[in-house]
């Protein structure tokens, strides 16, 4: 029997250079000996012999090898009138018998609706179509592989299932999508794979699956077929409470954590703990410290450990450094069952240049801009996403929803938003391209951020989004319908910079810089601010927070306690990076982590206890969290005593909540009988004193509290006399 395909066509199939092998392989109508028949063709380079088996009748028909490269064909007398029920039985070159089916007889996983939504860039469940999807077709189990590579000449699927020889597993194009697809019978969970892509110039390259759910431990780069739908969640109560939560009026004390260095384990690779161990340890620690949430530095797969996760190639895969996807699900689940929220850093601003990643994915500038003035980031040596392309926006927004849907994440903190908003960010004249109106605003990125926030808030009520945005861009945390970007919170970088600048001054000079503290209240309610003391403030030569404090040893600790006390009583949600709560001396090193051994010393244990107590005070007192974002919750009592470097203010909650009086003394000079005006008469109980002995202070304060004296002061009808501890904060609450 001679095939109706030419030898040159068969040779092209064997070489893997046919762009649409489904048009030649599988079942096709032919005219055989003057009548209609069906040709069944397969390409199995590793097969010695192949039989075609009818599933209904069990009829076994041998297929003829027509090319030594593994091209087999059988002619069936009956024409194609219904879907195939035939199977393949083959003996491979090792003598092993394998039962399978032809990849090219299986219908596409993509429906008309899928193709439409992908074309529009609005397929929110893209992760249920692209990548490696477990699938069963007519009783045959396998994996459906699909990848977006519109400018590729050909795409092969290679992996453990075919000895990394993709010639017999060439993907087929999905009409009008730029997607290539192939169902591989017998492929199964745990096998490694990649996509082998041929560019328009004929060059072959192996690429990671952008939608892969798991990957090998770096520096290895293959993806792993994974079923992410088997974990049994136990956090339904948490999710229901989250959906009903109002993030505007909820206490939020966030502990920022780098999982790779928070704690180490002996005998582990680089000391990395697994997700399950980390979950149990972090729950215990957060409970002890009264943190309400953890914020994880990026956990998506990244090749370079030194990037801390901010240069990802596996946006849909939790890093294998700490275990499997199911292990990370356990991490989130365990945190939720114990009342701790989980936020993650998410990096849609840029991606690395690693050859196996997204850059030049199909031989063209696919995910990035072709022009380096738009497509390369000068600071980080990374690529910038092309936010004007529907498919790229879809990839990123679906990724955000993926973490919320599949991993129950409670919030996304978007990294480097400022770099996304401005076309000239960190660029000189001539190094950037203006927008269509001649301006510097990145209009496509702005639309993307708005669409991202709309998608998150519409699909997952109660989930928060936070922007690390360091400019004066207006309306970052305002609703999109009001012209804003739609974030829940914005990091208050101005507060952070001004406050640390002030605290670095010797106390004797602080009277000349009081405006650095008071200025933040001029704009404090223009956005929904989070006050961050993040990892960025303790790296790259800046030193640790306590090392940035002036003075002798006692003053350094007192200044740090004062900094935290001022921060926790200032309007805004709170975020502290690990190590800050124990006053570690060295700046953060991702290889070493916090200096836990310092807790052998009373002074460091004192700072740790202070942070735990501040968290508790914020949680238990609505006045310190209910109106974080409105001026109704803040009132200056004394902002003008620069000479003594004293700041006094009132925090207020909802109607009926007792007000909180905060007195800060930014000098080492204690001040007795310091008169402070108050809005109501009664007893003001001291509920916190940063100079407490338990924290390492001198125990100078106002315990148990102060009674009003009936004397007007600070334009208030009554007043109290307080003792202001040196470099200290005292917090008082009206009891009656």
UniProtKB/Swiss-Prot annotation:
It comes from Rhodopirellula baltica (strain DSM 10527 / NCIMB 13988 / SH1). Monomer. Its EC number is 2.4.1.18. This is 1,4-alpha-glucan branching enzyme GlgB. One of its GO terms (cellular component) is cytosol. One of its GO terms (biological process) is glycogen biosynthetic process. InterPro entries: A-amylase/branching_C, Branching_enzy, GlgB, GlgB_N, GlgB_N_E_set_prok, Glyco_hydro_13_cat_dom, Glyco_hydro_13_N, Glyco_hydro_b. Pathway: Glycan biosynthesis; glycogen biosynthesis. It comes from the Bacteria. The lineage of its organism: Bacteria, Pseudomonadati, Planctomycetota, Planctomycetia, Pirellulales. It holds the Pfam family CBM_48.
